[in-house]
Amino acid sequence: MNEPAMNRSEGRAIFGLDASDYDIARMGYPAQLYDAIAARTGGSLAGRSVFEIGPGTGLVTRELLARGVERLVAVESDPELARLLSALAGGGDRLHVVNAPFEDADLGVDRFDVACAAASFHWLDTAPSLAKVHAALVPDGTLALWWNSYRNPHHGDLFAAAVLPLMAGLSFPPFQSAESHGSHDERFWRGELIRAGFGSIDHELVRAERTLTTAEVRALFGSYSFIRRLDREARERLLDAIALLAEREFGGVVPNVALTASYLCTAGPR
């Protein structure tokens, strides 16, 4: 979808370098998404066993714990993020953090009711990772994949369109480019899920509009892996240019279109 693409192993190691700033100016996920997952498990996540791929700073982890999951295995490849996750309040004996790449992670012998991956599955090799997920779920278990995208120039996002020239020459994560986000490619994800043995696939795209300050825009772009990977001088130069654009062209009142793309599906017969 884009070239050149960031190396997957590089991308996985970036976010733990500055975990405290990752969530600044990023949104949570719609409550209706968690409700939809719960609906597939009898109406509630309470008492369910769940594993989460790439929990990062624990945004989804905290919500799952709050909804009463009985067992939550969080598979996080970054050592610093794994350390922070282990200290999450309310986890107790219900939360077990596995610090390993998902491909190498030992999920144990007990199968799970639900698997979740929020803004992380693009860092994995799709086909073998889906196969591992399928094998780890109980029959008719639920897989939920979802992403937030904040640069949507083809969905009425004026600032995302205006900033495109500044994105030239950058290397983006797998399934992303300066103009598009791979989570919107419904045909691709449906095909991969079907080939991996999943069915009853529901796809939803939820739109949210908000206004950001210049400081929030700078923080948002500064949280992107394709900008974090730059050397300090190049990174600051680019972020300065983005902030200048926000001030000069938008008066520091920057429109932002955020899209949440989700795929919920059921593990079919093995």
How should each PLM-predicted stretch be described?
Residues H134, V138-A208:
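Conserved catalytic/acceptor-binding region of the Class I
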Residues F51, T57-A105:
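Class I SAM-dependent methyltransferase SAM/SAH-binding core
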Residues G28-G47:
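Conserved alpha-helix/loop element of class I SAM-dependent methyltransferases that forms part
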Residues A105-A115:
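A short acidic, Gly/Pro-enriched loop at the edge of an enzyme's catalytic core
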Residues L124-V133:
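A short, conserved alpha-helix within the catalytic core of class I
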Residues G16-M27:
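Class I SAM-dependent methyltransferase Rossmann-like catalytic core
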Residues A119:
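Short catalytic micro-motifs in class I SAM-dependent methyltransferases
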